[in-house]
Regions:
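Gram-negative bacterial Sec-dependent N-terminal signal peptides
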Residues: 2-25
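A residue-level marker of the well-folded mature domains of exported/periplasmic proteins
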Residues: 3-6, 26-375
Length: 375
């Protein structure tokens, strides 16, 4: 009898030891899911408070600013240019937009043309600063002030390209984290994710790495593949790639996360052709930027996209002008970084979403006008 009790006790102890890692793993995953839900809720909350600068130099006068867009088909680059143009008008500055047309040679040509116009400042609209470093340094040597939007992997100074005064962006790692965690939450912790990126851009690579970290932090989720497809050639590649991935992964593929909404402009037709339900079918598509007009429409209509982590494009355009104004006045950058914001069908008509853009209701235009001393 004593021996039986000893054996039974040993078996119970062994069972407890075996079960302990399972219990700990479950607790860790519960903690991760709680964190993910809280993060997503905060990212989707209304934006009502201005957290940017409240002091700075008054408007400098008589300036010409050139906005060099990497590709005006990119809704993000186009939107920032629109915001910068509006802010430049408030300043009384001359403003021009040049289109890099989605290729390295065309971007180089547009930058060279911008320098020839002898502006006071150049804004890089999602032009990778490392890619165009020699021409940027030519601009700086000519006395031109240069700021970037999505021109490097993080806000602030860009390593290796000291001539760029500051890089303006929502923190891309937080943008990517929001996209990744939304897939985790929406799936109930069971997302099988395809990641779409463009390694030409350092910021895209940084986003993709952060998306992967967010997804793989969930024990029941996994990344199926990372697909590196140039944004500038999506119209030719994305349709066939989507069809190929559907054939390879079938129903195992439940979520997509792309570094830009533009990917889904071209994935929707093959999904429809494959009989995927636009609202309830899989894969469910999420974008880690930038909040394009078609993306807002897809989310509102529940057609092949469930979320975008939108950039405040017009706000960023105004910030570009503010940072140039600070540089013209001999002052340092503001270091302002706008917080991330997640749009889903639940909040798609808030914070500018009704107009198909993330335009925060925090009074940023009035705040910048007060700093500059203009109406």
């Amino acid at each position: 009898m004593l021996r039986f009790r000893l054996i039974s006790g040993s078996l119970l102890a062994s069972a407890a030891i075996v079960a302990l890692p399972i219990v700990l793993a479950q607790a860790a995953d519960d903690t991760f899911m709680t964190m993910a839900k809280e993060y997503v809720a905060q990212a989707a909350a209304p934006v009502t408070t201005w957290t940017g600068p409240t002091t700075g130099p008054k408007a400098q006068t008589g300036k010409l600013v050139i906005y060099v867009s990497a590709d005006q088909k990119n809704g993000g680059a186009q939107g920032v240019g629109d915001g910068a143009q509006e802010a430049a008008k408030a300043m009384g500055w001359d403003f021009r937009i040049l289109d890099g047309q989605g290729s390295v040679p065309a971007r180089s040509s547009a930058l060279t043309q911008a320098i020839a116009l002898k502006p006071a400042g150049i804004i890089l609209g999602t032009i990778d600063a490392a890619e165009q470093a020699p021409i940027i340094e030519q601009a700086v040597a000519a006395g031109i002030k240069v700021v970037g939007w999505h021109s490097g992997p993080a806000p602030g100074k860009i390593n290796g390209v000291p001539g760029v005064i500051t890089n303006i962006t929502t923190d891309p790692l937080e943008v990517a984290k929001a996209a990744g965690l939304y897939a985790v939450v929406d799936s109930g912790g069971k997302a099988n994710v395809m990641l779409f990126t463009d390694s030409i851009y350092a910021i895209a690579t940084a986003k993709t790495n952060a998306e992967k970290a967010a997804v793989t932090g969930c024990a029941g989720c996994k990344v199926l593949s990372v697909e590196d497809t140039p944004i500038g050639d999506l119209s030719n590649r994305m349709g066939q790639l989507t069809t190929s991935l559907l054939s390879k992964y079938g129903k195992e593929w439940t979520y997509s996360i792309a570094v830009n909404d533009l990917y889904y402009d071209f994935s929707a037709p093959p999904l429809q052709a494959a009989g995927v339900d636009p609202a309830a079918g899989y894969p469910r598509q999420i974008s880690a930027g930038d909040g394009s007009v078609p993306a807002f429409q897809r989310i509102r209509d529940k057609r092949y996209q469930i979320a975008t982590v939108a950039e405040p494009l017009h706000l960023h355009g105004w910030q570009c002008i503010d940072e140039l104004n600070r540089a013209f006045a001999g002052q340092p950058p503001s270091t302002y970084v706008a917080p991330v914001h997640l749009f889903t069908s639940a909040n798609i008509d808030k914070d500018g979403g009704a107009q198909n853009i993330f335009d925060p209701g925090n009074g940023y235009k009035d705040e910048y006008r007060k700093i500059w001393g203009v109406k």
